[in-house]
Amino acid sequence: MKNINPTKTKSWNLLKKHFNNMKKVNIKDLFEKDKNRFSSFSICFDDIILIDYSKNIITKETIKKLIQLAKECDLNNAILSMFCGKKINYTENRAVLHTALRNHKNISIEIDGINIIPKIKKVLNKMKNFCSDLIDGNWKGFTGERITHIVNIGIGGSDLGPYMVTEALKFYKNHLNVYFVSNIDGTHITEILKYLSPKNTLFLIASKTFTTQETITNAYSAKDWFLKYAKDKKYLSRHFIALSSNIDEVKKFGINTENIFELWNWVGGRYSLWSCMGLSIALSIGFNNFEKLLRGAYAMDQHFLKQPFEKNIPIILGLISIWYNNFFNFETESILVYDQYMHLFSSYFQQVNMESNGKSIDRNGNLVNYQTGSILWGGYGTNSQHAFYQLMHQGTKIVPCDFIVPIISHNPVSDHHQKLLANFFAQTKALAFGKKSENNHIKLYKYDSNKIKILPFKILPGNRPTNSILIKEINPYNLGSLIAMYEHKIFTQGVVLNINSFDQWGVELGKQLSKKLFSILRKEKILNTSSYDSSTNGLINFYKLWKK
């Protein structure tokens, strides 16, 4: 990968000039000038996902210049470097190969001269056999009863990705009940375990390093809870599974080697749901459906790898985000999913996006002089309309949005889904085109001239950019494609912005400080003024006074 400061490229300077012509442009005017704008600015993927990006403050010239920027930043070679296993995560000297996890074509991919595909297939086969045994009732708990409850203990990528997918595909779930524990707050694990029985509960301890404080703390609490009932450690083998790359630490915990599903350091945590970290998904919906999830992601991988930039969905979406963040100074973007099953989707990609591209140091080790990752947030369904859409329609902050909705509902109750779709289409139309005073004058004067006073409050300026993403239905294959689409969008942004999207050094300091502070919190002694800064001292001392 080449390390190119995007602001030093010819394309960036051309985009700056182009922005001066575009900053006053209105989306409504763009549609009036081009009656076929939808056709010009929409892409259909495999007849399952439609991306309509026509309601953006862009022209064909904008897209042309953004694509030229991507080419100047050597995006094509960066994509090839990732897929073929080059160590593009240079700060950790690691390859980035979550794409290999869904490569079902048996095409060799090598790291340091070793083909990794056989290792992947071996773990997938082990997952398949385990899922079959447990779902069919052949894997029993220590009392001989069938396992009916699965508790995944992890955090970050070991939790939110599998949790999101399990919720999104709940329509496909079998008889197993899957729960997720992540927070180190004791309330989280307590509220889940209080309804479960040790005799039919299986724990998945999901931690690549098997040293993550939150996960290991919760894992030991789960172990204590289990042994309080089972009494003998020999029974752990029927109730504890490890998803990890640290075999030694897993053994220290007391989990048998045969109960370990292996992970590798070329799989980043936030991209790991495709690996053994997705065992909770496979147990919930069955391994065949998990394979369909992988196949859907693979299809999007091939689109990203092979389609020209002009028709490449992740690239187009990534470049439009850069356009808004760096030229319009729109600091946030939102994902709004009109599907109840998908209620965690925006939270998951908040993590993937902000942990990947929330960087201020470029790949050359220099402080950047431009914007990198956007603040990403979101919501789901019409609930969000009654929460924060007011700001999006009439506030002073412009928030580019992705609206996502399935065409086919799994629960077609009466006319609910048509009303949901009507709201979806209405919101993107209202955000783009608004409601001007001319439309209100006649109505207000006709009935009561005094009401003219409220006229300014009823104006919606419009010109709020959105992408409309229609997905035929939420099924494992389609969801896999959608997730991979966003993964590659984030990668595109990282390459063009010259940052490493696959490390997360910013989270380390807080972890280190918390370990030191934990030992202090266990002591009764009040801190003196020289121990830490006055704020930290004061907070700790109040804790010690009040906990009594």
Curated annotation (Swiss-Prot):
GO cellular component, one term: cytosol
Active site: 355, 386, 511
Protein's UniProt keywords contain Membrane: no
Subcellular compartments: Cytoplasm
E.C. number(s) listed in UniProt: 5.3.1.9
Pathway(s) the chain acts in: Carbohydrate biosynthesis; gluconeogenesis; Carbohydrate degradation; glycolysis; D-glyceraldehyde 3-phosphate and glycerone phosphate from D-glucose: step 2/4
A Pfam family it matches: PGI
InterPro entries, per the entry: G6P_Isomerase, G6P_Isomerase_C, Phosphoglucose_isomerase_CS, SIS_dom_sf, SIS_PGI_1, SIS_PGI_2
Catalytic reactions of this protein: alpha-D-glucose 6-phosphate = beta-D-fructose 6-phosphate
Signal peptide region: none
Keywords: Cytoplasm, Gluconeogenesis, Glycolysis, Isomerase
Molecular functions (GO terms): carbohydrate derivative binding; glucose-6-phosphate isomerase activity; monosaccharide binding
GO terms, biological process: gluconeogenesis; glucose 6-phosphate metabolic process; glycolytic process
Similarity annotation: Belongs to the GPI family.
Function statement: Catalyzes the reversible isomerization of glucose-6-phosphate to fructose-6-phosphate.
PANTHER family listed in its UniProt record: GLUCOSE-6-PHOSPHATE ISOMERASE
Protein name, UniProt field: Glucose-6-phosphate isomerase
Gene name of the encoded protein: pgi
